[in-house]
């Protein structure tokens, strides 16, 4: 029998999740975000869970506005729900650089980005992230970002962290998605974890430990979606 992923996110009460969505997320969701979310579900089915949930999108949008962020970076795009949330939250002269090797998934979201009138705020780069980030670091006019959002291959999070600490300005924030990994980080023994999820669980737990001892950042782990860890760069 094929392995079926558990429900994404750490909130296991479906009724409570729907209450949160219906009272504080769906009512203010931009129409193009709603249409993108529905198109992603239609195209990818259960795999649409790779997209950030609507409440997490609202959280990130508010965070960007509170920060007065203007220049942001996104590593891992999928169909672009978080990317569109970001572009809508940025001011007219804001810019988000988005990196993903899968142009096809991005094309699903592109019509909704265009309808929302924010395509000019987005610089999409089809590539693996490490070489692009290295290229930025080697540039004489090295960019300085206010905010970075990472939702990509978990095994590379430690590597991305070192690169992003040089690209995000002091006082800026790096946000890492999926840092509670279906809530499985709290399981005490591997036998309680579905075998296909064990390796990434181990990687995430090691990464969380690394962040907790990294004196270069101040962290806050948010229990929204599948877990989001905010890292404020201190030095």
From Swiss-Prot:
Belongs to the class I-like SAM-binding methyltransferase superfamily. Cation-dependent O-methyltransferase family. CCoAMT subfamily. Its cofactor is a divalent metal cation. It is an enzyme of class 2 (transferase). Substrate binds at residues 8, 151. The keyword Transferase applies. This is Caffeoyl-CoA O-methyltransferase. It comes from the Eukaryota. Pfam families: Methyltransf_3. Methylates caffeoyl-CoA to feruloyl-CoA and 5-hydroxyferuloyl-CoA to sinapoyl-CoA. Plays a role in the synthesis of feruloylated polysaccharides. Involved in the reinforcement of the plant cell wall. Also involved in the responding to wounding or pathogen challenge by the increased formation of cell wall-bound ferulic acid polymers. A divalent metal cation binds at residues 151, 177-178. It comes from Populus kitakamiensis. SUPFAM superfamilies: S-adenosyl-L-methionine-dependent methyltransferases (SSF53335). GO terms for biological process: lignin biosynthetic process; methylation. Binds 1 divalent metal cation per subunit. Keywords: Lignin biosynthesis, Metal-binding, Methyltransferase, S-adenosyl-L-methionine, Transferase. It catalyses: (E)-caffeoyl-CoA + S-adenosyl-L-methionine = (E)-feruloyl-CoA + S-adenosyl-L-homocysteine + H(+). The keyword Metal-binding applies. Its EC number is 2.1.1.104. The lineage of its organism: Eukaryota, Viridiplantae, Streptophyta, Embryophyta, Tracheophyta. S-adenosyl-L-methionine binds at residues 52, 74, 76-77, 82, 100, 129, 153. CDD domains: AdoMet_MTases. GO terms for molecular function: caffeoyl-CoA O-methyltransferase activity; metal ion binding. Pathway: Aromatic compound metabolism; phenylpropanoid biosynthesis.
